[in-house]
């Protein structure tokens, strides 16, 4: 029997979460393969040690979807973020990653719902996210969840810059 559950990330899952994040990032963004710039970025940003630090800093900022206790998706909230367009403090959905084989099963929707509930519990009235301008699947998903585009920003890596769409949702 398959059991899907959602919960806050555990330190003991840091390695598995690291692999999950790297896998989804590669599947989504390695359009031209894994460049050195790309490899350097994901090696640092998604290392088990970096994941451990995120969990230690604030366990409620990393929500994990599990199938039979194995990570299949993740949502990361950055509470002390600022909207790059409006220049105001607003929490950011930094990541919403689901393994490709679990697309279409409501995992992303549930992770989004869990993240929004966490933000609302802390008294916030809105939520921002940035998404790669060419990631149409994600943009369409976010629009279906009530997010609207408020502008564009650049996402810098080592040698290249990538255009991201900034989206926002205001809670009633």
PLM features per residue range, with description:
Residues 106, 123, 146:
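Short glycine-rich hinge loops at helix-strand junctions in the catalytic core
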Residues 2-5:
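Extreme N-terminal starter segment of soluble prokaryotic enzymes
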Residues 97, 147-148:
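Short acidic-aromatic loop segments in the C-terminal HATPase_c
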Residues 12, 16, 136-137:
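Short alpha-helical
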Residues 99-101, 105, 133-134:
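Active-site acidic-Proline motif in GNAT/NAT acetyltransferases
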Residues 112, 119-130:
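Conserved GNAT acetyl-CoA-binding A-motif
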Residues 8-12, 19-31, 39-101, 109-114, ...:
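Acetyl-CoA-dependent GNAT
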Residues 87-91, 125-128, 132-140, 144-145, ...:
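C-terminal "cap" of GNAT-fold acetyltransferases
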């Amino acid at each position: 029997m398959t059991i899907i559950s959602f919960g806050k990330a555990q330190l003991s899952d840091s390695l598995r979460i690291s692999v999950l994040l790297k896998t989804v990032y590669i599947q989504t963004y390695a359009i031209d393969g894994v460049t050195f710039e790309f490899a350097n970025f994901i090696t640092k940003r998604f290392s088990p040690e970096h994941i451990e630090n995120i969990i230690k800093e604030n366990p409620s900022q990393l929500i994990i979807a599990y199938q039979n206790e194995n990570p299949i998706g993740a949502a990361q909230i950055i509470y002390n973020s600022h909207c790059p367009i409006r220049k105001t403090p607003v929490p950011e959905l930094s990541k919403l990653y689901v393994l490709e084989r679990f697309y279409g099963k409501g995992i992303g929707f549930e992770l989004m719902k869990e993240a929004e509930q966490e933000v609302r519990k802390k008294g916030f009235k809105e939520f921002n996210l940035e998404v790669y301008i060419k990631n149409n699947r994600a943009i369409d998903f976010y629009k279906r969840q009530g997010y609207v585009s408020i502008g564009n920003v650049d996402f810098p890596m080592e040698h290249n810059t990538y255009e991201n769409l900034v989206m926002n949702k205001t809670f009633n």
